[in-house]
Structures are given as structure tokens and as C-alpha cells.
Amino acid sequence: MEAITKNGSLSQTLVHCGPKSLSSFIPVRCLRFSKNPFPKKLVVTRARTSINSDHEAANRPLFQFPPSLLDDRFLSISANQSEIDSLGRDIEALKAKVSEKLVCMDVKERIHLIHLLVSLGVAYHFEKQIEEFLKVDFENVEDMNLGEEDMYSISVIFRVFRLYRHKLSSDVFNRFKEENGDFKKCLLDDVRGMLSFYEASYFGTNTEEILDEAMGFTRKHLELFVGGSNEEHLSGHIKNVLYLSQQENAEVVMSREYIQFYEQETHHDETLLKFAKINFKFMQLHYVQELQTIVKWWKELDLESKIPNYYRVRAVECLYWAMAVYMEPQYSVARIILSKSLVLWTIIDDLYDAYCTLPEAIAFTENMERWETDAKDMPDHMKVLMRSFIDLHEDFKREVILEGRLYSVEYGIDECKRLFREDLKLSKWARTGYIPNYDEYMEVGIVTAGIDMTVAFAFIGMGEAGKEAFDWIRSRPKFIQTLDIKGRLRDDVATYKDEMARGEIATGINCYMKQYKVTEEEAFLEFHRRIKHTSKLVNEEYFKTTVPLKLVRIAFNVGRAIDTNYKHGDGLTYGGIVEGQITSLFLDLITI
């Protein structure tokens, strides 16, 4: 479960910085590159403990984690149910007006509106309508693009179709090239077009060279545009997109940012803006209620008085993670299920990584495999943790039993056991000083990335996820496998330094250095190259997958949650990385 639980630092990346005022929509982000070079060292050769040590307990791999973001600011907030009900009525009234717009517009205008609905976080209200329109419109897309020379428009059309799994050819961008293959100089005069073209490049696959070129070309010039003579709100929007593209960012964060940007656009649609603001406030109040539920559950669990303080308490951070997977209000129960699971997975991951001895890790894994509350051969605190974990799943069963979906929880339990078996292998490597080669490491690492388990638990609270959805995960489809690899790579880069500090020398970076005889710097550069390559594979498999779009999107969003939390460091361990985003969702309620 490392892909959601560890820390590290990442050189040569954009970092999030700026004021954290509660009066702003989201903290300003600015561009800053690390000046710290990678040390040119080779592999650490031995861990500090041995499987035969007589002093296992004395040599626990203790590690001091930073505190949670959950403080009095979050504990004091509340949501008024009457306000939620009132906002719900307003949403229904405005929804009808927006739906009319979708029907009455011509094809190109409608696609631009769909792009706005997605960016503002309200497209989920019209998903069936949108899918039906785009299915028909895609058949006539060549006529739609004929003679179109506006880069912004072409990029928006490209992004919308690809988002809804229609693979519009990237050849549409050839019109923006000179005969010598360079992009036309006149494109630099269209800042919004350049930004949209940059966003479009994130939908590329490994066979689309023009989108690789577009990403480099547009990013280079967008960085120059920031702080230039452009409008302040446009510069701020560019900063946000350069920090995380819409394709990488959590939808809920992207929507919050885009609403602020759109409000300051001169020609914004007042009805659409009002609808987006009311809808976002409606969602925020649901999130506040969910946080209250999770905090209440955590306090009643009272693990802090029952087990040693070796772990991270990450209630608000785990809910933020779940919100990145699905933001819609109708998935409140699903978010709570996923959040509670994430909270306990994090503690169990810390048990394996940062506290238990090897005999304890073996006993814990064997008892989890039996799935019985009368655990044997374990310290009392581990028995308490195991009972809490099993009891949580009994709660989940009660939640889904009336829907006839007990299989969803049973499948989730199987995924947990699979993960714990692989976690034990990592523990053995760490405690015995074994450094596998990279290929051997990845066989374990793609499981401990936790993607399969996270997708499975994300489906538990979704009534529309039937048995076939879980069978799909069990079949280990290539789409999920590529997400596994991407999650593993992101985690390995972000958590490397902390893992080494804990004596976990069998890290992805270290194993790669060992197998290929390269320096740390070279290993990091290769991992970044592989992340980019794997992101394109994810896109390719997204287009190929025949599972219902809603379910594929949830799995895809698990990958976005990885990007949101790990692209610029370990946001789950070091909450300051994502504090601005979390603050903007829970504490800075949007003003209507």
C-alpha cells in the first residue's frame, strides 16, 4: 500500500508554494525548481537488522512521522442540512436551464459547452445526455473540423472527445505546423489556445509524436507567459495547469480552480457560473458532513490509546484522496467507505514498514489470511488493529447486504490479503538486507502500489458496480496493470529518501541502481521517463477498455489521485504538499 502511504522528496519538479489564506479560493502556485543535485552515489548494501537478530524488538525500524492536518480548524466546521436542501433545489432549477442549452446549440458550440461543464465540475449532471450527443457528433467530426484554424477550438474538441473515449486523431494538429515541421510562430499570440493545446497533449499515446512535441513547445512558452503582460487571473490559471494538468489533477480541485478563473473571464455565462458555484457549495457541505462521520468513527475506534504511536493519523487526508476518486454528492457513502479503508491501510502499511519485527510481520500476515478475530502469536496491540480492520469490513457488509452485493466486500478482502502477502515480502527484504534486482522488485511493487485494492474498494459503495466490475479487476486487465506501474513509479520517486532513512534498502530506485549499475540521478531520470511513458499507456488502454465509462473513470481517477498526492512529493505523509487544496475544499467555502 506504499503508493498511498510514504514520503520522499523529488528534485527538478514544480513545487506548490504561496500563501495559505482562508480568504482565497486556492493558494497561489508558483514555479520553482530544486537546485539540489542528485548525489552520485551507488547502492546502500546492507540493512541494519538481520532475520536472526536476538534483539528484534530493540531494533524496530522506528520512524517519526509528521502530524496530521486534522486540527481544530477542521474539527470546528459544520454543515447545515437546511442549507444543503435549499442548494439542492436551486441546482435542480438551474440544471433544467443548462440542459436546454445543450439541446439548442449547434454541434461545435455544444462541445465547447461540454468542455465548460467538465471544467466547472458539473458535467456529471448531464452524463447520459453528453454521451449520446458525442456518440452522434463523433461520426461527423471531420466535417466539424474542416477549415477550422483556431487552436483553442481544435484543442477543446480533441480533449472532449478523448475524455469521453472517442479517439479523435491527433492529426488534427498538423494544421498548426509549418512545412519544415515546426509549430507556426503565430500560435504564440494565442495564450488561451496554447494553454488548451498543452492540456490536449496529456491525452496522447506512445505513437503520437506530435503531442509530445506540443507538450514541450507549449510548456516552454507558457512558462514565459506567467508573470508577463497577461491578465492576472489568466497567469494564475496557467500556473495551476503547469503544476498539474487537468488530466492529472483531481476533478474536485480542478473544478474549484476553474470556477475562480471562469468568474474573472470577461464573457462568462452568468447562469453557468451560478450553477457551478451552487453545485460546488453543495458538494463542499457534503464533504464536511463526511469528515464529521469519519472523525467520529476514528474517535470511537480509539486506536490512539490502544496501539503504539508508530503510525500516521490521516483522516482528512484520506477523505481528500477519496474525493479525488469521485467528487459527486451521490457517492457520499462510497467516499466514507473508501476513506475509512485508507485510514486503516495507512496504519497497517506503517506497521509493516515502520514498526513491527519480522516475526510479528509474519504472524500478522498469517492471521489476516485466516481472517479470524482470535488472532494468535501476536502482541495485543496488533490483535486490536486486526480486530478493528475485520470489524470495519463487517460494517461494510451490513452497508451492502440489502443490495445483494456482499460479493463486493468479499472481493475487497481478497485484495487486502493479496496486498499483505506482498507487504510481507518487502518487510523480509528490509529486515534481511536483501536487495532484489529491479524486475523481481516490480513483481511485488506493482501489488503494493495498492491500485487494484483501491479500485475494488472504490467500487464497493457504488451500486452500479455489479459483479462483472469486480470480475474485471480480478482479470488483471492491462488498463489496471498500467495504472499499477504508474502508481509504483510515482511512489518510488516520492518516497525514496524516507524509505532509505528507515532502512528499507529494497526500494525501486535502489533496485534499479543495482541492476543497471547507474547513479541515483540517472535512476531518477529514468523513472520520470517511465512515468511519462506509462501515462501514455494508461491513455491508450482507457480508449480500448469496453467496461462502462463511469467505472473506467473511477479507476482512472485512482491514477489521478496518485498524481495529485505524489507528483510533487508524498502528500499523504507530508500534508503541507496538499494543504492548500484540502483547505480550499473544506475550510474556504465558496461564495455564491
UniProtKB/Swiss-Prot annotation:
Binding site for Mg(2+) 1: D349, D353
Record-level Gene Ontology MF annotations: magnesium ion binding; terpene synthase activity
Main location: plastid
Pfam families noted in UniProt: Terpene_synth, Terpene_synth_C
Co-factor binding comment: Binds 3 Mg(2+) or Mn(2+) ions per subunit.
EC number: 4.2.3.167, 4.2.3.168
Organelle targeting peptide span: 1-52
Keywords: Chloroplast, Lyase, Magnesium, Manganese, Metal-binding, Plastid, Transit peptide
Binding site for Mg(2+) 2: D349, D353
CC per GO annotation: chloroplast
Catalytic activity: (2E,6E,10E)-geranylgeranyl diphosphate + H2O = (3E,7E)-dolabella-3,7-dien-18-ol + diphosphate; (2E,6E,10E)-geranylgeranyl diphosphate = (3E,7E)-dolathalia-3,7,11-triene + diphosphate
Binding site for Mg(2+) 3: D491, T495, E499
Placement of sequence motif DDXXD motif: 349-353
Keyword Lyase set for record: yes
A GO biological process held by the record: diterpenoid biosynthetic process
Family: Belongs to the terpene synthase family. Tpsa subfamily.
Protein name in UniProt: Bifunctional dolabella-3,7-dien-18-ol synthase/dolathalia-3,7,11-triene synthase TPS20, chloroplastic
Species per Swiss-Prot/TrEMBL record: Arabidopsis thaliana
Gene: TPS20
